[in-house]
Design a protein with these regions (language model features):
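Broad phosphate/nucleotide-binding scaffolds in NTP-utilizing and phosphate-metabolizing enzymes
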Residues: 1-241
Length: 241
């Protein structure tokens, strides 16, 4: 077994152990401490553990109303875009590898990431011709990490515990297996973005980013930069209207 794969399996085991402590905790302080530790572990691992936490937070939104569910939803919501980002230098190296040229020949500037996901992170940048763009760059080595995750889905199910109400883990597992290539190939995501933009072209209240074709690759998705709100803000604002 490769060293990276072994390390990730050990991380899965630690995460499962933390999840077990969360399920067994009968003291609120212990439960909250275990929950925060679990969220931190999921965020650091990225890949499917973080994606599982993201899906769990959305699932819990449909079960709000009791304290345990609300607290769990608030904790797991951090995983939707607040994992520790890779250093800017690492992201630039990945961009240069994907584009086959120095980043200075493409961009005027690029900012450190403030928007991270389970498979990649987003940077705000300005192209040489002055366009503000969103650059989504895939984490280096994430494909191998996800393949390791797929082999250990039993451990990945541990965080669900008593919080899995309304969340169909078996169906989610099948979705991941069926759509793995789409998850990891940003050219396919770009195609979906183009199609969605075409379908909604006449919607005045909907803005769909435009793909920058010449800079989009399997590992990098570049689109126009559009300002917006987080999902939590949207839900909160809609609920008050």
């Amino acid at each position: 077994m490769a060293l990276n794969s072994l390390k990730r399996n050990l991380a899965h085991a630690r995460m499962a152990h933390t999840a077990l402590k969360l399920r067994r905790a009968d003291d609120e302080q212990l439960r909250e401490r275990a929950r925060q530790h679990l969220v931190n572990q999921m965020g650091k691992m990225r890949g499917l553990p973080q994606k599982l936490g993201q899906m769990l937070s959305f699932s819990l939104e449909d079960n709000t109303g009791d304290d345990e569910t609300d607290e769990g939803q608030n904790a797991y919501a951090r995983l939707q875009e607040s994992a520790e980002p890779l250093p800017l230098g690492t992201a630039v190296a990945e961009l240069e590898k994907a584009w086959g040229k120095p980043v200075e020949t493409v961009l005027q500037s690029i900012e450190p990431s403030e928007h991270t996901g389970s498979l990649g992170q987003v940077h705000r940048a300005v192209t040489l011709d002055g366009r503000y763009v969103a650059i989504k760059v895939r984490y280096p080595g994430i494909r191998g990490a996800v393949m390791t995750d797929l082999k250990t889905l039993g451990w990945l199910s541990a965080p669900m515990g008593s919080l899995r109400r309304g969340f169909d883990l078996s169906s989610y597992r099948q979705v991941i297996l069926n759509n793995l290539e789409c998850e990891l190939d940003y050219r396919l995501e770009a195609e979906c973005l183009r199609d969605f933009g075409s379908w909604t072209a006449n919607e005045q209240n909907l803005v769909v980013p435009t793909v920058v074709e010449e800079l989009t690759t399997e590992e990098v998705l570049v689109s126009s930069w559009e300002e917006g709100e987080t999902w939590q803000d949207v839900r909160r604002n809609w609920s008050t209207q």
